[in-house]
Swiss-Prot record:
One of its GO terms (cellular component) is ribonucleoprotein complex. Belongs to the universal ribosomal protein uL29 family. It comes from Methanococcus aeolicus (strain ATCC BAA-1280 / DSM 17508 / OCM 812 / Nankai-3). HAMAP family: Ribosomal_uL29 (MF_00374). This is Large ribosomal subunit protein uL29. The keyword Oxidoreductase does not apply. Keywords: Ribonucleoprotein, Ribosomal protein. The keyword Ribosomal protein applies. Transmembrane segments: none annotated.
Length: 65
């Protein structure tokens, strides 16, 4: 998952934003379950970045309303 910048997110349509949000939430859930079962994360900063990306997408979706 590449880092999504706010400018890239703003260029997406509403349906693309919803699809991307679902995709990122699934990835975040997978990382959290891996952490909960005692596994070591492949990239420790990934969870933080995924959470920030979800927040960015939700913020921009709210701005477009």
């Amino acid at each position: 998952m590449a880092i999504l910048r706010a400018s890239e997110i703003r260029e997406m349509s509403a349906s693309e934003l919803n699809d991307k949000l679902v995709e990122i939430k699934k990835e975040l859930m997978k990382e959290n379950s891996n952490k909960a079962t005692g596994g070591a994360p492949s990239n420790p900063g990934k969870v933080k970045e995924l959470k920030r990306t979800v927040a960015r997408i939700k913020t921009i979706m709210n701005e477009k309303k």
